[in-house]
Regions:
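Thiamine diphosphate
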Residues: 142-200
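A positional/architectural concept
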Residues: 138-140
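Cofactor-binding active-site loop characterized by glycine-rich and histidine/acidic residues
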Residues: 4-134, 152-158, 163-170
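Charged, amphipathic alpha-helical interaction segments
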Residues: 101, 132, 136, 189-196
Length: 200
């Protein structure tokens, strides 16, 4: 082995349909934020394979000039504003972007992707509460594989349904097959339409 990649690489194999389906449902010009499992999100947003691999190898023309690595891929020119290695930290950034959009009088939608482990972070619930209170146009996309590291939801939370838990904040929720891009797109499009019409 040559030890050529100087970055941790967190694969998202099997979850590609989520990024593809959601991004296909978003209006043009939407902003997105993601997690460290961001490869499919970066590529679905329009980032090039050349830039993707350059970043993993720590070289130009990586989107982070070869310094961001796999876990911090971004492509603002394609609407992918930020991803982060720290669990849950792009959720408040996305809510802030949606607040800025509303403050300017725009009707754009912001999407934020996160794993179900991010629901253990207080900042998730604080962000959800603020988005609900201000009726911000944010699509919260939970990529739920049922585990945070190795711990199932039933051993981490008192609730069993994420969509029911967020409904307490008067937010719409839906759950579908994350391996079916067509199903994801259909569900996301319905939510985006409602969000644009009525706010969060």
């Amino acid at each position: 082995m040559k030890d050529e990649m100087k970055t941790p690489v967190h694969m998202g194999v099997g979850g590609e349909a989520i990024a593809v389906g959601v991004l296909a449902a978003l209006p043009e010009g939407s902003k997105t934020f993601g997690t460290y499992r961001n490869h499919s999100l970066f590529l679905a947003a329009g980032g090039s394979l050349e830039a993707f691999f350059a970043e993993l190898y720590g070289r130009l023309p990586g989107p982070g000039k070869g310094k961001a690595g796999s876990m911090h891929l971004a492509s603002p020119e394609h609407g992918l504003m930020a991803t982060s290695a720290v669990v849950g930290t792009t959720v408040p950034l996305a809510v802030g972007a949606a607040f800025a959009e509303a403050y300017r009088g725009g009707d754009g939608v912001v999407a934020v992707f996160f794993g179900d482990g991010a629901l253990e972070e207080g900042v998730f619930w604080e962000s959800l509460n603020f988005a609900s209170l201000k009726r911000l146009r944010v699509l919260f996309v939970c990529e739920d594989n049922g585990l945070a590291i190795h711990t199932p939801l039933k051993d981490r939370q008192g609730y069993r349904s994420i969509t029911q838990a967020v409904s307490a904040f008067h937010c719409r929720g839906d759950a579908g097959d994350g391996a079916d891009a067509v199903d994801v797109r259909s569900r996301a499009a319905a939510l985006v339409s409602a969000i644009r019409r009525e706010g969060g």
